[in-house]
Amino acid sequence: MTTSRCSHLPEVLPDCTSSAAPVVKTVEDCGSLVNGQPQYVMQVSAKDGQLLSTVVRTLATQSPFNDRPMCRICHEGSSQEDLLSPCECTGTLGTIHRSCLEHWLSSSNTSYCELCHFRFAVERKPRPLVEWLRNPGPQHEKRTLFGDMVCFLFITPLATISGWLCLRGAVDHLHFSSRLEAVGLIALTVALFTIYLFWTLVSFRYHCRLYNEWRRTNQRVILLIPKSVNIPSNQQSLLGLHSVKRNSKETIV
């Protein structure tokens, strides 16, 4: 094992002045206590006279909060809801609340863990149409939906009454042998209903597309996992202690 001349003072980067040496990683346990806390020092020998990396990690004093695992999303413990370990993540990232995970999977529209890429067994249920009508999405989509609904409720009876009056007038003109006026009124009625149906169809297709997209990305996710993945309360403190010890031994290059 080859190392350069490096100082071992905690929280101070070593001063290395040795010549070029092959890259060698060394991890030392100084065995000393500073303020009652053990210090873990990692050194990497110099290459071409330059220090590659040095990490000093302090193992924090054990506390009741460090001994208990917590949800990696909300950072809360198991006082309100049991913690699960449904994927292959370990340590402090391996525990999570069921409700937090279901909410995250619903918001991200995914079915796998973003860290270990473990695919969860989930059941997706579409949300009802009433919920979309209450909250269709962004503000401009709300205004568009509200405006089109008002226009539809206002234009539909207006177009119906106008078409009926035009047809009634065309029939009266036919009785009085005024064919030109009757043809004009019939053409006006056809144009009126064509424009109305075209606008209704375009608006309906637009909002159906928004609803289908909202329904696809806002599904209710139910996590299908066995009860065996729940972390018993009598093992939570032991799990937290092991995770703290394991994290204290990690080093960074």
Curated annotation (Swiss-Prot):
The keyword Phosphoprotein applies. PROSITE patterns: ZF_RING_CH. The modification Phosphoserine is found at S237, S243. Zn(2+) 1 binds at C71, C74, H97, C100. A zinc finger (RING-CH-type) spans 63-123. Interacts with MARCHF2 and STX6. E3 ubiquitin-protein ligase which may be involved in endosomal trafficking. E3 ubiquitin ligases accept ubiquitin from an E2 ubiquitin-conjugating enzyme in the form of a thioester and then directly transfer the ubiquitin to targeted substrates. This is E3 ubiquitin-protein ligase MARCHF3. It comes from Rattus norvegicus (Rat).
